Amino acid sequence: MSIVALLIGLGPLIGWGFFPTVASKFGGKPVHQIIGATVGTLIFAIILAVVTSSGFPTGTNLLFALLSGAGWGFGQIITFKAFELVGSSRAMPVTTAFQLLGASLWGVFALGNWPGIGHKIIGFTALVVILIGARMTVWSERKEASNAKNLRRAVVLLLIGEFGYWLYSAAPQATSIDGLTAFLPQAMGMVIVAVIYGFMNMKAENPFRNKITWLQIISGFFFAFGALTYLISAQPNMNGLATGFILSQTSVVLATLTGIYFLKQHKTSKEMVITIIGLVLILVAASVTVFIK
């Protein structure tokens, strides 16, 4: 692995690792966050399409790319709602675990991954380890009823949001276009969902006139940077799909730690140790699910 490939492979660490923290730092409600983030992603995607002349898909390729982006928009709205309940440092490991679980199960039952009994035993064991790791990251010494209730609500929300993230990753598999070509219509699908959600919240306030909404465009740049560098990293002449995926998953570590330290989402020393162990379990088990394909 060259230095250039490694640096590109760690791009998602920066983009996706800082995205939830930046979005939370700017504040606002989920409606402000999703509109700003998706507009930022769309701006990034338009510039990228112009610079690379990547073309624009049509027909079913366009439809599935739009559906993919719409799925992400739905999933991210739900995730932002979970941030309100438990903070990004607790929500991110859980949503990452659910996404790994969903992608792996889809790969096994729809795409024929993990052939043979031995691979399936290893794979499903790894999924159990991922869930154990996620549970460890949200463990708390304080057994307050309100905290437990908020955590349960957040987990349910994130489980629902996984359907959107699953669509985000699964829909492009029905197309004949590469990730770079799909990026712009995906961003359009994200914005469509965000705008619809914005209009659904118009009775409370007009989110399109709130300055926080447009400040959140910066958070969208972080997400888009992570997505772009992942697409490049996954190319065979760079890191390849398996290594690129594993490098991208390190973003959950940065997202969790920046949430704790930058957003002051306090954890005790014991909670920190257990959280770190949980994150390591998630990363190691995620690596296993990739290499047994």
From Swiss-Prot:
The chain crosses the membrane at residues 5-24, 34-51, 58-80, 95-114, 121-138, 153-170, 177-199, 212-234, 241-263, 273-292. The keyword Transport applies. GO terms for molecular function: carbohydrate transmembrane transporter activity. It comes from the Bacteria. It is a multi-pass membrane protein. It holds the Pfam family Sugar_transport. It is found in: Cell membrane. InterPro entries: Sugar_transport. CDD domains: ribose_uptake_RbsU. GO terms for cellular component: plasma membrane. Keywords: Cell membrane, Membrane, Sugar transport, Transmembrane, Transmembrane helix, Transport. Its main location: membrane. PANTHER family: TRANSMEMBRANE PROTEIN 144. Could be involved in the uptake of ribose. Belongs to the GRP transporter (TC 2.A.7.5) family. This is Putative ribose uptake protein RbsU. The lineage of its organism: Bacteria, Bacillati, Bacillota, Bacilli, Bacillales. The gene is rbsU.
